[in-house]
Amino acid sequence: MNIIEQLEREEIARLAKTIPDFEPGDTVIVNVRVKEGERTRVQAYEGVCIARNGGGLNESFTVRKISYGEGVERVFPVHSPMIDSIKVVRRGKVRRAKLYYLRDRRGKSARIVERNDRPAKAEKAPAAAE
């Protein structure tokens, strides 16, 4: 293990965020801290995870939802301090790692079949630094 990987593992352990095991195709609720003036509040953002990018500290994921008839995508860093929590609502059965084709689909063709083979796992704690 090189020094960079070791530093990233130590930083992830220091952050001590519980991140559920989710994949593209899963419907997730991301609770995001939003600052409005002087106060902060938590806003829920529910949608389909269409991609996961990167690894380690720089890992991010893209969530797509339809809001008032318009498609809205938002990219979240997994280890961002602005993310309060992530909850997996349902598991989706897909055969691709990147679901960008959903951008061109509307209605029934944009549906994702629910996966029944395994339930949503309990949240996993980050691996301890060795």
From Swiss-Prot:
Q: What superkingdom heads the lineage?
A: Bacteria
The cross-references to InterPro entries, in alphabetical order and at most eight, read: Ribosomal_bL19, Ribosomal_bL19_CS, Ribosomal_bL19_sf, Translation_prot_SH3-like_sf
Output the SUPFAM superfamilies linked to this UniProt entry.
Answer: Translation proteins SH3-like domain
Gene3D superfamilies named among the record's database cross-references: 2.30.30.790
Gene Ontology terms: biological process: translation
Q: What are the protein's UniProt keywords?
A: Ribonucleoprotein, Ribosomal protein
Q: Which GO terms describe its molecular function?
A: structural constituent of ribosome
Cellular-component GO terms for this entry: cytosolic large ribosomal subunit
HAMAP family according to UniProt: Ribosomal_bL19
The UniProt entry's sequence similarity note says: Belongs to the bacterial ribosomal protein bL19 family.
Protein's job: This protein is located at the 30S-50S ribosomal subunit interface and may play a role in the structure and function of the aminoacyl-tRNA binding site.
Supply the name of the protein: Large ribosomal subunit protein bL19
- Give the organism, scientific name: Methylorubrum populi (strain ATCC BAA-705 / NCIMB 13946 / BJ001)
Q: What is the lineage of its organism?
A: Bacteria, Pseudomonadati, Pseudomonadota, Alphaproteobacteria, Hyphomicrobiales
